Amino acid sequence: MHKKSIDHVIAINNAWKVSCFWNELIYPEDFPESKLPPVVHKSKKLTSAETYVAAQNNYGGFIYGGGTMAFTAGYYALYQYRPKTIAFIGCDMMYPEEGKTHFYGDGTADPLRDDITLQSLEAKSTRLMIHAAKQGCSLVNLSQDISRLTFPKISIDLLAQPPKLIDWNILAEKEALQLERKLNYFVASGKYWEQVHLFDKVNLQKIDQLWLDCIKN
């Protein structure tokens, strides 16, 4: 990986094992301690729910933002570092029935569980991308494989020049945000699964569709 145009690398969950060139590891509350790095150099940082929940809450919380670490890491990076570009790699959330899905073997990750916040990964991806663009930040996908992320795909060699910000339908975004505020589906602790009975699946589908309507290919 070329480091010239990359200021900060955030590894998600087990991804710290891929390379030693990471600055920060972000992981969920239920991540086994045995899977954390055995030794963490003073130049590296571990980030848990104690830090990232407040960050994602700043963008509407986990019910609207999506309860999976790929999106949580994105909102955290936006809040904490306010970068011009966030480049994702290895976060495509594709899980074929056969074959290797992760560098460590077969994965059964967050997007496969029955989660009311993850009915449309594409919608949640688009929502994150638009919130980033409003901060002047471009989201891109460095993976060249099929992806559930809706971010533009680019080569890592092009990161030295900040990618162009996306265009989106402002009216559709306004409608999505208005519906989010009206429903007020928010759990400050981030533990939305403890109150999932309070949230309507169909209403969340409506919000997802509005975010998808923001960008028409």
Go through the PLM ranges and name each one:
Residues 1-217:
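Metal-ion/cofactor- or nucleotide/acyl-coenzyme-handling active-site neighborhoods
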